[in-house]
Every structure is written in C-alpha cells, then in structure tokens.
C-alpha cells in the first residue's frame, strides 16, 4: 500500500485598490478600497419589499451615511468601524436610493403568499412577486446599480420555514419523496438568484430585522 501525501495550500489573499492585499474583505476595503472603483460619482441603490421595509431601508441608508464606531474594543477585527457612505468611503463614491416607489410589494400580495398552504407554491409566488418589482426597476429611467430585496418578517417566516427544516435533516433522495407523493419545494434564495441572473444589476437579500429591530 503506497503512502498518500497531503499538502495544504495557503489561502490566497484578496486584492484591493493600489495592488493592496489583505485576508479580511472588510479591512481590505477600509484600507484601500475596491480593486476597481465605481466609474460614476454615485452607486444607485434600489429596494424591493413591503412599504415598511422599503421605507426602513431608506432610513437605514441615511442613518449609516456618516459611519459609526465598532461595537467592542476587545475584538476590533470582528466589529471594525464603519466608514460611512459618503464620497470618502472605501468605494470612493456616494450611495443613493432611487425609484423607491417602484419596488413595493402590496399588502395583499404578501398576505396571499403567507396564507398559501403549499410550500412550493408559496416560494414560487414570492419569487414571481419579487421578480415583477425587479423587472420594473430594470426598466426604470434611473435603473439602480444594486437592489436590496428587503424581505418583511411575514415573507421570511413563510418562504424560509421549509428551508430551516431542510437544514435540520438531510433529504437523501428527493426523487423518492416526489414518487411517494411528498411535496418537495424549491429554495427561495436559490430560485430568486437564478431568475435574477439576466438583470443588469446585482441583488442582495436582506431580512427586515437587520434594519428594523422593532
């Protein structure tokens, strides 16, 4: 029996502006900015969500514009200072919320998804509803550069409920589940990311609790 030799390759550091390298993406951005800076003066941010989460997302962006200090002195690397969103931030540009009125999911849409008894159908309905708003932003005269999908609590509880169950137990054979008549539902996050790939901007899913602790 021959010996099997193993080797651990060092993890490459991330590259930032001015050929700066750093293992931590947050500290690297803070010290040198991105490898390629934004070509304009402003990064336009769109938001899709309920009327409340769209409003709170705008308030959150305004609140963090001037930056804030890190949480703790004991572990500064875990919670570094946040430099803010003005021109001197690491991205060398401003962040501006645009087309806020065009990304709102109606209360009726959210209620209908929340009350849908089928997990699979609820996920598909939620993705369809979000995609409709993303496509409106895509066609807007102020098309955003990035869009926050700010999910309200009611949608999070509905479309993530079955995913939490999947994390707790390994489903070895979904084909067997389908054959036995047991419903297999799609992954909301994966389905939305796949559907949004053709859009001309990036999306980031954000939970309501991140900017609306109440």
Regions found by a protein language model. Give the residues of each.
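Long, low-complexity, intrinsically disordered terminal regions
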Residues: 1-214
